[in-house]
A protein has these predicted regions:
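Terminus-proximal functional modules
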Residues: 1-214
Length: 214
């Protein structure tokens, strides 16, 4: 079962995942790049303590050491990969602490890591926006013929040579007129989404640090 959810707070996400576990749905996967898709599998209902972290690892060995460290402390890694960022743990030892973080600064650091990674994701989409703008042809919305730039195409007689030129250029014409606007829209949407995550996470990070010093 897949569910689409967005959380700006790890605490709210943890509570929701615990409720899903109580309803008989175990978290199996959270998509990468901070997307909103959670994958669950049916499981016996259980009252469980779930905690979330955010880390990206350079090597698989570092990731495995990270999971092992938590497991030795009574927390089992239930979802997340080396590159996914979002990491989820279930408490398996009732004698372990109720949190995977020892203090507020370390708990706040996950928001800083999330903010930095969201900002980095923006750089993937910005070139796509500029690339789309470079090939965009606004005249196409009023005059679709303008998408075909072969000289004299529309003044030529409709014959075999005309159809060959028309069909040959069609993929490029569609890209200029329709793929480019879609690419610009999609890339802009993702860029704004990641900028929002960056700003929101940075704000929570600062609030947590300020609250800890008061």
């Amino acid at each position: 079962m897949k569910k689409i959810k967005f959380f700006s707070s790890f605490q709210d996400e943890e509570k929701w995942l615990e409720q899903m576990a109580a309803d008989g749905y175990k978290l199996a996967k959270r998509n990468t790049l901070q997307t909103l898709i959670y994958t669950f599998v049916p499981a016996p209902p259980e009252q469980v303590c779930i905690r979330a972290d955010y880390r990206v690892f350079k090597t698989q060995h570092d990731f495995q050491d990270y999971c092992t460290l938590f497991e030795d402390s009574g927390w089992y890694h239930i979802a997340g990969t080396k590159d996914s960022g979002n990491q989820y743990f279930k408490r398996i030892d009732e004698n372990s602490n109720e949190d995977i973080f020892s203090d507020t600064p370390s708990r706040a650091e996950r928001y800083k890591r999330l903010s930095n990674n969201a900002f980095a994701c923006c750089f993937f989409f910005v070139p796509l926006i500029f690339g789309g703008l470079m090939i965009l042809n606004l005249d196409a919305f009023l005059n679709p013929r303008a998408l075909w730039v072969t000289p004299g195409l529309w003044e030529s007689e409709t014959n075999f040579m005309w159809w060959r030129a028309f069909l040959f250029e069609m993929p490029f014409a569609l890209m200029r007129g329709y793929v480019a606007p879609f690419m610009i829209f999609l890339s802009t949407t993702f860029t704004l989404f990641y900028l929002f995550i960056m700003a929101k996470s940075r704000k929570i990070y600062r609030m947590m640090l300020n609250a800890d010093t008061d």
